[in-house]
């Protein structure tokens, strides 16, 4: 994974190997974007990124749309730099899909951003969140699930 904010000890504890963005570009069969929206990641996935790919991976964008230059992604799909894409977000949060160049392509799947939501998933998400808070307040740090940024004991 490439995450400049994930402390290496936390990555190791959850069996994640941190690598550079260049390593991702050269080695990945699938690239899954989960970036938060910040000025630093605006158009992170651009022509330079896609042109640096070595393996024609599948590209998944489940983050905010601003991190992907959609014109560059379209060029990467057309040139074969990206073999396929799964998209549930666009730069425009309410896109007009009647004129969207990704619609109708054999190598693109578009889903609504809320694709996983169900009554069961909301309940599970709430239970995990409350459980994490309780474990944290009791200083049971090893019991906290889905740590993104490490917890200092």
Predicted regions and their residues:
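The conserved SAM/SAH-binding core of class I Rossmann-like methyltransferase domains
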Residues: 2
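Rossmann-like adenosine-cofactor binding region
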Residues: 5-100
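Rossmann-like dinucleotide-binding domain for NAD(H)/NADP(H)
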Residues: 56-153
């Amino acid at each position: 994974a490439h995450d400049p904010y994930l402390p290496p000890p936390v990555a190791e504890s959850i069996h994640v190997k941190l690598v550079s963005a260049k390593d991702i570009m050269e080695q990945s069969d699938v690239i899954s974007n989960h970036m938060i929206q910040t000025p630093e990641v605006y158009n992170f996935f651009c022509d330079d990124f896609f042109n640096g790919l070595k393996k024609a991976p599948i590209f998944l964008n489940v983050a905010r749309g601003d991190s992907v230059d959609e014109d560059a992604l379209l060029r990467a799909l057309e040139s074969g730099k990206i073999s396929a894409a799964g998209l549930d977000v666009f730069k425009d949060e309410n896109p007009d899909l009647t004129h969207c160049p990704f619609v109708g392509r054999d190598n693109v799947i578009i889903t609504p951003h809320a694709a996983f939501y169900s009554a069961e998933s909301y309940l599970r998400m709430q239970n995990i969140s409350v459980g994490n808070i309780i474990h944290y307040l009791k200083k049971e740090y090893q019991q906290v699930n889905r740590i993104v940024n490490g917890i200092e004991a």
